[in-house]
């Protein structure tokens, strides 16, 4: 299925993206670029980020159920929103958690449609 070197690279890429997404999501708002464009772009960024994490996680950890990956990433998305809400310097938003869930679902669809040959 995979060469072990490729699997290590995928795992490393997943964890780099995971750390980057969390660092960006939990950064104080003054350090973020202003959101001058449409609000839908914020939701799209959530979906793209979590979709990317889903694809990388499923490819990097083929022994883990896709559904377990999905649940763990959904929990992570909710945890980020809770931390933003209680942190006092960001705003937790349930719509962001929904956008995260949409991204996870899109990631699973991408894996099934595009990466099917790698996994089955």
Language-model-derived ranges and their functions:
Residues 31-40, 80-102:
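Interfacial helix-loop-helix junctions of multi-pass membrane proteins
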Residues 116-120:
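Short, charged juxtamembrane terminal tails flanking transmembrane helices
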Residues 49-63, 104-115:
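Membrane-interfacial alpha-helical segments at the cytosolic side of multi-pass membrane proteins
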């Amino acid at each position: 299925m995979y060469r072990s070197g490729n699997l290590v690279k995928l795992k490393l890429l997943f964890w780099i993206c995971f750390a980057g997404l969390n660092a960006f999501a939990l950064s104080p708002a003054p350090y973020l670029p202003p959101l001058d464009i449409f609000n839908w772009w914020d939701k799209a960024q959530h979906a793209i980020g979590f979709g990317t994490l889903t694809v990388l996680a499923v490819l990097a950890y083929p022994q883990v159920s896709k559904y377990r990956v999905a649940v763990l990433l959904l929990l992570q998305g909710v945890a980020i929103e809770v931390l933003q809400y209680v942190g006092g310097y960001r705003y937790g938003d349930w719509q962001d958690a929904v956008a995260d869930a949409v991204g996870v679902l899109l990631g699973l669809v991408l894996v099934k449609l595009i990466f099917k040959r790698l996994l089955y």
